A protein has these predicted regions:
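Class I SAM-dependent methyltransferase Rossmann-like catalytic core
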Residues: 38-58
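C-terminal helical/coil "lid" or tail adjacent to the Rossmann-like core of SAM-dependent
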Residues: 40-42, 48, 229-290
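Conserved alpha-helix/loop element of class I SAM-dependent methyltransferases that forms part
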Residues: 55-74, 89
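Class I SAM-dependent methyltransferase SAM/SAH-binding core
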Residues: 77, 83-133
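A short acidic, Gly/Pro-enriched loop at the edge of an enzyme's catalytic core
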Residues: 132-143
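A short SAM/SAH-binding and catalytic strip from SAM-dependent methyltransferases
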Residues: 142-156
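A short glycine-rich, Lys/Arg-flanked "PGG" loop and its adjoining helix->strand segment in the class I
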Residues: 157-172
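Conserved catalytic/acceptor-binding region of the Class I
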Residues: 174-242, 251
């Protein structure tokens, strides 16, 4: 197959390796009288999840991406682009940069390409690739961008080392992750807290870490990056922000928790009545007297120049 050009970078179109990556549906298999969980993307692969990702991206553009922009001519690697929920924002904010967005899922890439075309953007190319077998030479990219990816990986430190090797000296690595342990809300609800914990536990069962946001600084330093800075980005919602009550509390966070209902019950983490009560109480925080807080973490590090 022919190679393709992204900006001034030539990308080798090689077959995918067979390494396991994170973008696969969560599944439980019956083994005797127990359920075992396979390594997977805990939120699943289906149209409703794709819609949730789009809602999340739309609600969080200013909070997460207002300070992300790349110089003209830069070649930027976006790892784990999924359905392009963040890609459109990146491309719009840096119209003269060249983006190569990769994902393991052909279906997600097809949807991402459609979104880019619909937005009239021409500075993005897509490539199907495994995160631990990226077909690029070292020091190929001016910048690397990763959003909501590390939480799904069993080896996030190894992934960051790979991304750092792909950076040119003085290039930046930007990582954004959430932390479900940062969630607080009113009215308080033990059932809602238990429902959130089901998601945290399921993600741990499949090798991920829903609490990874708090670990970004040590992870980036361990990867060898310099001048690492991590900033908390808190989503605060009350009745004065009905837009966020709908877009974030209902369509993003609670939809994400509700999406693991069947898996949590099958895994024996909860029962249907308890889980459903928790989801109802999360929706309750979007009412006129409710309050909801959640913190994302954005880390940026620079690859040092050789001594």
């Amino acid at each position: 197959m022919a190679n393709m050009m992204v900006g001034r970078l030539e990308v080798q179109d090689t077959p995918l390796r067979d390494a396991i990556w994170f973008r696969r549906c969560v599944s439980f298999e019956l083994a005797g009288d127990r359920y075992t969980v396979s390594k997977a993307y805990v939120h699943g692969y289906h149209p409703r999840e794709n819609e949730r990702l789009r809602d999340q991206a739309g609600a969080l553009v200013e909070l997460l991406h207002a300070d992300t922009a790349y110089p003209p001519g830069s070649v930027v690697l976006e790892v784990g682009c999924g359905v392009g929920a963040q890609t459109v924002t990146l491309a719009v904010q840096s119209p003269e940069a060249h983006f190569l967005s990769v994902d393991i899922s052909a279906d997600s890439l097809a949807e991402a390409e459609q979104r880019i075309r619909a937005a009239g953007l021409t500075n993005v190319r897509f490539h199907q690739a495994d995160i631990f077998a990226l077909p690029f030479a070292e020091e190929s990219f001016d910048h690397v961008f990763v959003c909501f990816v590390l939480e799904h990986l069993s080896r996030p430190a190894e992934a960051l080392e790979i991304f750092t090797r792909l950076l040119k000296p003085a290039g930046t690595l930007t990582v954004i992750e959430g932390d479900h342990g940062s969630t607080s809300f009113f009215p308080e609800s033990d059932a809602a807290s238990r429902a959130i914990q089901c998601l945290v536990t399921l993600q741990r069962m499949v090798g991920g870490n829903a609490l990874i946001g708090r670990q970004l600084y040590p992870l980036l330093v361990e990867a060898g990056l310099e001048a690492v800075k991590v900033s908390p980005r808190m989503v605060y919602v009350d009745a004065s922000r009905p837009d966020l009550a709908n877009a974030f509390i209902k369509k993003t966070f609670t939809a994400m928790v509700a999406g693991v209902r069947a898996s949590a019950i099958l895994a024996g983490l909860t029962d249907s009545d308890t889980f459903d009560a928790g989801v109802r109480d999360l929706y309750r925080t979007a009412e006129s007297d409710g309050v909801f807080c959640y913190t994302f973490f954005k880390g940026v590090g620079i690859k040092g120049r050789p001594a």
